[in-house]
Swiss-Prot record:
Entry binding sites for Zn(2+) 1: 63, 65, 141, 211
Keyword Transmembrane found: no
Gene encoding the protein: rnz
Single GO term (MF): 3'-tRNA processing endoribonuclease activity
Record-annotated active site: 67 (proton acceptor)
Catalytic activity: Endonucleolytic cleavage of RNA, removing extra 3' nucleotides from tRNA precursor, generating 3' termini of tRNAs. A 3'-hydroxy group is left at the tRNA terminus and a 5'-phosphoryl group is left at the trailer molecule
Stated name of the protein: Ribonuclease Z
Complex and partners: Homodimer.
Length: 306
């Protein structure tokens, strides 16, 4: 799987950073792509990448602030002409996202050539799609804002070649039956596939947060995540200022990483007042401290594979 950032700035775009947008490539589990937030200019950012809008079958919105949704109407209309014709799209977000899109499309007299299924979240969402489990929990941002916990499917355990050879089954196409089915037939005998495979392997857990100040639900979302994407609007100075505006300070994020036992964290949504050079300087300073957990301040077009 791979996460790509198309926008990493908070509130306003800068000359170096666009507003928020994240793509989650589901390979090898699926050929589809999920987007998380669509800030203004997202579709233009995507033009500089190999991702195709026709592969986007889900869009998740964390909250209704403009730097997270102003690019959505344009991206939806462009999807009609970039491989999305006739391909259903599921749009998940806070209450109001459906009215926002339908009103924008109606007033601009825009037509889509594919269906949209809207799922509006009140307080919590539990959603399943092709083996993926998605949980959304309310955060603390002054308006409804959500964090998403994505659990990838279990994958079949490794085939025990030695055990299969003991019954006379040599490596070949038949091994796919063992891998993909509960039972398989060989020489007129029905076998249980699980007797010839290792334990199923748990897929990665990804936590993607909307804007928030520290709150109890954060640890539920991030618990033992392999990868966490979290905002840090404030990456230096007095953290009380961040919390006054219902945002997170980098110290808040580090505390969450430790308490939730997160493997690695990708930090985005840094204030638009920071230049890339300033972010890099602060990053080096933080990483020089022995207590700093594994993290990265991401830039536009950064990708992380796992």
């Amino acid at each position: 799987m791979e996460i790509t950032f198309f926008g990493t700035s908070a509130g306003l775009p800068t000359k170096e950073r666009n507003t928020q947008a994240i793509a989650l490539n589901l390979e090898p589990y699926s050929n589809n792509i999920w987007l998380f937030d669509v800030g203004e200019g997202t579709q233009h950012q995507i033009l500089h990448h190999s991702i195709k809008l026709g592969k986007v079958d889900h869009i998740f919105i964390t909250h209704m602030h403009g730097d997270h949704i102003f690019g959505l109407p344009g991206l939806l209309t462009s999807r009609s002409f970039q491989g999305g014709e006739g391909k259903p799209l599921t749009l998940i977000g806070p209450k109001g996202i459906k009215a926002y899109i339908e009103t924008t499309l109606r007033l601009s007299e825009s037509k889509l050539n594919y269906p949209i299924t809207y799922i509006e979240i009140e307080n919590h969402l539990s959603y399943q799609n092709n083996g993926f489990n998605v949980e959304a929990h309310m955060l603390n941002h002054g308006i409804p804002s959500f964090g998403y916990r994505i659990e990838a499917p279990y994958t079949s355990g490794k085939i025990d070649v030695s055990a299969l050879k003991e019954i006379g089954l040599e490596p070949g196409p038949k091994y796919q039956d063992v891998k993909n089915n509960e039972t398989f037939e060989y020489n007129g005998i029905i076998y249980n596939s699980k007797d010839f495979k290792g334990d199923a392997v748990k897929g990665p857990v990804i936590a993607i947060f909307g804007d928030t100040m520290p709150c109890q639900n954060e640890e539920i979302i991030a618990d033992h995540a392999n990868v966490m994407v979290h905002e840090s609007t404030y990456i230096e100075g007095d953290k009380s200022l961040a919390n006054n505006y219902h945002h997170s300070h980098i110290e808040d994020v580090f505390t969450l990483i430790e308490n939730a036992h997160v493997d690695y964290s990708l930090i985005t949504h840094m204030s638009n007042r920071y230049t890339i050079e300033e972010v890099e300087t602060i990053s080096k300073s933080l990483k020089s401290l022995p207590t700093t957990p594994p993290f990265k301040f991401v830039k536009d077009f950064d990708s992380w594979s796992f």
